[in-house]
Amino acid sequence: MSTAIYYSTHNNMHTNDDITNGSGSTTSGNPGANPSNPNHTNAGATINNNSNIGLNSANKNHTTLLPSLAHIMPSNSNNTTNSGSSIDISSTLINPYSSGAAAAAAAVGGGNGGYYHPPPPHSQQQQQQQFDTSYSNQTTPTSAYTNFNNDSTHSPTDISMQQNMNNLASSSGNMSIGGGIDGNFSHNNNNNNNNNNNNNNKCICKSKVNKIPRPRNAFILFRQKYHQMVLDEGTVIRTNPEVSRELGRRWRGLSPQEKEHWNNLAEEEKKNHAKKYPGYRYTPRRNGRNKNCPVCKNKPLPNNKSNSISGMSGSGGGGGSISGASSLSGGLTSRDNSITNANAIDYQQQQLQQQQQQQQQQAIQFQSLPPDQYQQLIKQQQQQLQLQAQLNGGGGGGGITSNPQTIPQYITNGNYPSYIISPNPYSTTSTTAPTTTTTTTTNASSIGLSVPPTATTTSTSSQPTSANSQLHFYEAEKLSPVSSTHHQSSISEIAAQQQQQQQQQQFMYNTNYSTIPPNNTTTMQQHSAGTGNDYSLNGNNSGNTGYDNRYGYGQPMIITGQSQQGLQVQQQGQHYNSGLHAAQHYQQQQQQHHQQQPPQ
């Protein structure tokens, strides 16, 4: 659609213009024509409506009188309503749904006899597009501002500015009306909510209309009699608590005859109250709370009312208490005494089941750990058990020894064959002989040779570890029958053999018949990690019989990349499995050695 609009920049009124509406869109004007001729055809508009769709009529010419508001409104005198005009004030500048649409249409639409015809809704978008196109054409350089056929005295810039202001005014008016309604509505809602909250938060305990007052006693009657008198004295007493304090001091200073007078008045008051309210019974509020009052029902209970559960506060007497029971009893309190003892016992059982499940999970995790970490975790568990025993153990031996349920299941579930729980469960203990766990000890301080710490081992059955001795996991009679019978005899025999070995070692190393070079001993001491071959010092690998092969009964195995603790376990298992047989073999070797020595 091609639309061209021509405005005049002068103040002259031009009429009697010839306009040809067709495909050519040509106009001609006579500036010097008679201005008194009021008849003109489509003044100030040249329109080609052949391409418009959805309009009522095309190429329609209206002949109307010039309205009196021509100098006020920036529009043409002929308002071509629904005719595809590029400047349609009634359809584009005025919102048909606003409150002032009818008045504006009556003022503008002079060509239609003062009637306003709102456009259909489906044509508003097309008309808005036409208005945008006409506005862009007004601002383009192709628009020639010449003296052609325009009755308006305003420039195109003024017209566009005023049109934009009208649009903003109409839209802002609607927005202000809606905003005011919404704002008032929200304000009213807020006020209603605040009023409801205030009503809900009011205490209704003292505002009961039908509540029967209590009969007054002697002091209340005395205070009501002299309350105003104390205020009238003009002293520093001003408040009700001060008045009550002063009257209480005076009440205590009354004579018995005067108190008898007030007591008689109180008795009479009570009789009259009983006659007036025959079924009255004083019912105080329980625990200082009123269930019907929205404020008082949420008040906390006094400290003396919050009783703990009596069934959970066991002291461990008689040795039957569980370690976690006393710890649970401290945190379980009943605010309104709704939890019963049965519920508390159920809760305790649930807690115990959870603890057992956690212990089973820990046992599975511990079994997959290496020996070093396993030993550390065992020590930590034992320390925790000892602390719990000290905290929870009461009278009658309520410690760990009397509470078998506190022992973790990974200790007592029978994963290990013996009653003795060694620090390292991966150590191999042989059960071929009754005294296999009992080994000999050599006093390295009395000998000139430095022996590694793994060589000095103790009897695990007679000298248990500190953790085992504290937990008392075993007793002497609980061991195997053979070991329990030979327990004392084996210890005495080993002590005698140790003394004999020490005497022989002192004699041997003090003489010059030792075949061990001293340099090898120092190099062995300086070695940081050890070689695993510490006990075969004199050609034991080559098959020669040296004097120190008493430590290695059998060929030792060298394992590299092993920890010191692993070496200790291995050496204990390899070098001391024979028990007393190793000591007997050593005695035979010593006898052969003394026979081969030359006389001194």
From Swiss-Prot:
Family annotation (SUPFAM superfamilies): HMG-box
From start to end residue, where is composition biased (Gly residues)?
Answer: 313-322
Q: What induces it?
A: Expression is regulated by WOR1.
Q: Which Pfam families match?
A: HMG_box
The GO terms describing molecular function are: DNA-binding transcription activator activity; DNA-binding transcription activator activity, RNA polymerase II-specific; DNA-binding transcription factor activity; double-stranded DNA binding; RNA polymerase II cis-regulatory region sequence-specific DNA binding
- Give the region (Disordered) as residue ranges: 1-59, 112-160, 180-200, 266-337, 427-549, 564-600
Q: What is its subcellular localisation?
A: Nucleus
- Family matches, as CDD domains: HMG-box_ROX1-like
Compositionally skewed regions (Low complexity) per UniProt: 20-39, 47-59, 188-200, 297-312, 427-470, 497-506, 564-574, 581-600
Gene Ontology terms: cellular component: nucleus
Q: Which residues bind DNA?
A: 212-281
Gene3D superfamilies attached here?
High mobility group box domain
As for what it does, the entry says: Transcription regulator that functions in both the positive and negative regulation of filamentous growth, depending upon the environmental conditions. Recruits the TUP1/SSN6 general repression complex to achieve repression. Regulates genes encoding cell wall components that are specifically expressed in the filamentous forms such as HWP1, RBT1, HYR1, ECE1, ALS1, RBT4 and RBT5.
Task: Give the protein name, as stated in the record.
Answer: Repressor of filamentous growth 1
Look up and give the organism this protein is from: Candida albicans (strain SC5314 / ATCC MYA-2876) (Yeast)
